[in-house]
Amino acid sequence: MSGRRWGKSLICQVITCLESMQGKRVAYITPTYLLAKAFFDELALLMPANVAIPNRSDLTFKLITGGSIRFFTGERLDNLRGLKFHYVIIDEASFIPNLEEGWNNAIRPTLTDFQGKAIFLSTPKGKNFFYSLYLKGVDPSPEWESFKFSS
């Protein structure tokens, strides 16, 4: 958790690049399609052209390492059903409606096959599901870690 313009998204975009270059499947979820498209474009600048093949219409990257990156919106979390990932990044999680239901029914099951990991990041917006996840890491629950930075 941190304020605006701190660099959370950039850090997670770098993590996305590194994980996918190791042959892993990564999902990157944003609250809106517009933000997913903007992050796709930013990631296209980070990914070496000889390593990743971008598909702008599907908002995906296929890597020569066997890894992949797929962007999704929080508006349609059911689109993740039936898929599997090593890593899921949920950016601006506080702004995704019905995130708790989406996490339990659509996102979390995608991590089961690979015993994958998820990163939730956001600018705070009240005491919603993102806040309850943040408290799990403060608790500290052994499966959760939380970080807080000022802008």
Give short role names for the model-derived ranges.
Residues 1-151:
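Phosphate/NTP-binding elements of NTP-utilizing enzymes
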